[in-house]
């Protein structure tokens, strides 16, 4: 029971984070590009909006899975996908930051990405019973 509550919190937290990120990327692409110092070229705007669509899709997948059992063999594909997403995102953001690209967007994203990567990794190796 306690594990179900913990994974419900994990799914809710990651869904809300990805939903906020997805809405921002989908509806404010020019503003986000300006914040990062990137030009608002049409193809970059398109890539930002497509990234937002993917974040929204991921958010709804996590949100709709909140009532399911996680850990061990239960919902392993979704757990692995979340581990891969947040771990890869964390490494990418940390790599950018160590290369000297430390701005508000990186700082705002790196903390939740690292926390969620570790949380999902823990869910991957935790038994639900």
Enumerate the language-model features and the residues they cover.
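Non-cytosolic membrane-interface motifs at loop->transmembrane helix junctions
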Residues: 36-45, 74-77, 101-111
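Membrane-helix boundary elements
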Residues: 8-10, 21-46
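Residues within membrane-spanning alpha-helices of integral membrane proteins
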Residues: 8, 15, 52-55, 79-86, ...
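Short, Lys/Arg-rich, polar N-terminal cytosolic tail immediately upstream
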Residues: 1-7
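Core segments of alpha-helical transmembrane spans in multipass integral membrane proteins
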Residues: 19-24, 44-67, 80-90
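Membrane-helix boundary connector in multi-pass membrane proteins
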Residues: 91-108, 124-125
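Membrane-water interface at the C-terminal end of transmembrane alpha helices
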Residues: 115-129
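Juxtamembrane helix-break-helix junctions at the cytosolic face
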Residues: 62-75, 97-98
């Amino acid at each position: 029971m306690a594990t179900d509550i913990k994974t419900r919190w994990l799914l809710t937290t990651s869904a809300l984070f990805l939903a906020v990120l997805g809405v921002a990327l989908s509806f404010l692409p020019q503003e986000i590009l300006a914040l990062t110092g990137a030009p608002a070229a049409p193809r970059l705007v398109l890539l930002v909006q497509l990234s937002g669509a993917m974040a929204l899709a991921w958010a709804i997948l996590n949100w709709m899975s909140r009532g399911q059992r996680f850990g061990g063999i239960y919902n392993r594909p979704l757990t692995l996908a979340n581990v891969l997403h947040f771990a890869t995102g964390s490494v990418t953001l940390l790599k950018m930051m160590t290369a000297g690209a430390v701005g508000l967007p990186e700082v705002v994203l790196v903390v939740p990405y690292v926390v969620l990567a570790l949380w999902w990794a823990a869910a991957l190796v935790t038994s639900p019973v």
